[in-house]
Amino acid sequence: MVVINGYSFKTQQLLTQQPDHSQLTQFVQPQSQSTHSVHPGPSPGQQQAGGSMTMPSSSTGKGKREWDINDAIVPHVPDQEFDEFNEWSDGHVRHIYSLHNEEAKKHISGWAMRNTNNHNVNILKKSCLGVLVCSQHCTLPNGSKINLRPAICDKARRKQEGKACPNKSCRGGRLEIKPCRGHCGYPVTHFWRHSGNAIFFQAKGVHDHLRPDPKNSSVSKRAFGRVPLAGKSANGSVAKKSVIAGLVKQAKQQHSLISKVLKRPAVSNPLAHTALDIYQYNACGKCAGYSHCTCSYLDDSTTARSHQLSQSSNYGTNSWPLSGSESSAPCETAANVFTVNHQHITYNYPIYHATPAAATAAPSKSPSLPYACSISELAAYQQSSSGNSFAMGVPVHGHTQCQAVAYDSSPQLATPEPEFINYSQIKHLGGGGGQEEISCKAEPGPTIKYNATVETQPYVEDNYDYYYSPKAEYEMQQHHHQQQQSHQQFGGNQTAGHHYYESSSGYNGVSYFDTGTTTAPGNTATGNGLEVGYGGYYDHYTSYEQQMAVAGGFATAGGSTAPTVAAPPGHPPPPPPPPTLTYHHHHHHHLHHPAAATGLAPSVTH
């Protein structure tokens, strides 16, 4: 048996009936034409080894080859029978190219053909992408239409679509894809197959669009920017200038960033100045405004005031070398500084003090926010704790002049930002919704919301929960407590509210804890009282604190406690209710004082 184009024939029929072979070819010819191929009929063939056949050309030219690209066995073609390469193959055609033909090996085509998945790995299948045309169907000066070759890459082709028409006379035209639908509504398909010494090519379908312009045509180059429309030199210079401008901008941005990074250690280094410098800066009452201190607080001649020199004995063996210093810089009285910030005190973290310069930029991690409170508040309140107290923000030394201090949404700090901060228990004030401005000229004191959680800092973000002071400041607070227990706060009760225990940090002192039971007056009804989640971490202490507060006669119902008016100068102030204290076994030393709700400032202020 011999298989020819899928038909089986007996060997005896081919060998013994040579005169009848013409009838065989006539039988095969209609079958081949019924497959929609336009090939001429084969000539009398010769049997080849392996079952393939070579059919030489007839006297009128090359004969039609009876093969299909999907055949299991394709015919063997002699070298003299190879076709010349055709770049614009159109219609149902078959070509056999030499294995050494460079164009055939590259599968080149004038049409925009892209690779398509095929189930047969031995056959390369390509489909036509169509042509790029103008949306306005404009006509070139030579009378032709815009027909540009689409890019094979999907990304590049998407960039081509929507570009302006390269025709100079076109107005508003855009390039768009006209897809190929020449093969039964589908793109025309090309097949390539390498077999033996030949490359077989077969096309199915007729292109229903014009031939696209080649890539190197002038219209194509002008359309896709390979040749500038306004001249090569002008466009090139503009592009070069834009690139240079972009590089200069990047360099400036990097330079500014580097300068900020280099300046930051000099500003925020917590150990840049000594403790004496920082204390002198904090003690300065001359600059009670909201900006940088203008005093030479780093000058050796400008030291603490005389009323602070009396406290130098408290700083022996500590980091505050105040002994032997004299006061030479006259500062304003501290009566015009009356903001008191009670802050949490924690000793189980390293304690650092930022530099005074950092106090203006560090509080909210943003240099754009102003520094809202002078550090001299600390010294002002230390002076008041030696026998005077502030009631609801009204100055006590008889000063009734207008104070240019207002509580706004900007951060207010009594001390610079520490190095380590626990952000888990921050208390939000909602952007200063309950803040009021300080009135002037002996008017009733405004409602200043503050307690042990530094409520004068209305942060929207979670920042600055705890503020730390060194051991020396805390011992100074303890010293003031011991001096003033008999005549100011506790009315002779020397042991009222004092719980001593030894912590792991070596501190033996008072354990103050704020459970959030002291609500600022006038703020509970307005929704600016203590938030629900504030005391959640210490819920087991809250009930005890509330019981102690009720037992001590401190009523928080309604949140409106009558403000206490300051006593005239020379008279001791009325004693505030005893503080509510809680003894607990972790190393967070917190201040809880019910006087914070009434505006009475306790003696511990750091």
Curated annotation (Swiss-Prot):
Pro residues compositional bias, start-end: 569-580
Skewed-composition ranges (Basic residues): 583-593
Record SUPFAM superfamilies: GCM domain
Gene Ontology BP terms: dendrite morphogenesis; embryonic crystal cell differentiation; glial cell development; glial cell differentiation; gliogenesis; hemocyte differentiation; negative regulation of crystal cell differentiation; neuron differentiation
UniProtKB keywords: Developmental protein, DNA-binding, Nucleus, Transcription, Transcription regulation
Subcellular location: Nucleus
Bias (Polar residues): 20-37, 490-501
Signal peptide positions (record): none
Residue ranges, compositional bias (Low complexity): 44-61, 594-606
Tissues and organs where the protein is expressed, per its UniProt entry: Expressed in glial lineages within embryonic procephalic mesoderm. Expression is highest in hemocyte primordia and longitudinal and nerve root ganglia.
UniProt keyword Nucleus present: yes
Main function: Transcription factor with a minor role promoting glial cell differentiation and a more significant role in hematocyte differentiation. Gcm2, together with gcm, is required for the proliferation of plasmatocyte precursors, the expression of Croquemort protein, and the ability of plasmatocytes to convert into macrophages.
Name of the protein in question: Transcription factor glial cells missing 2
Species this protein is from: Drosophila melanogaster
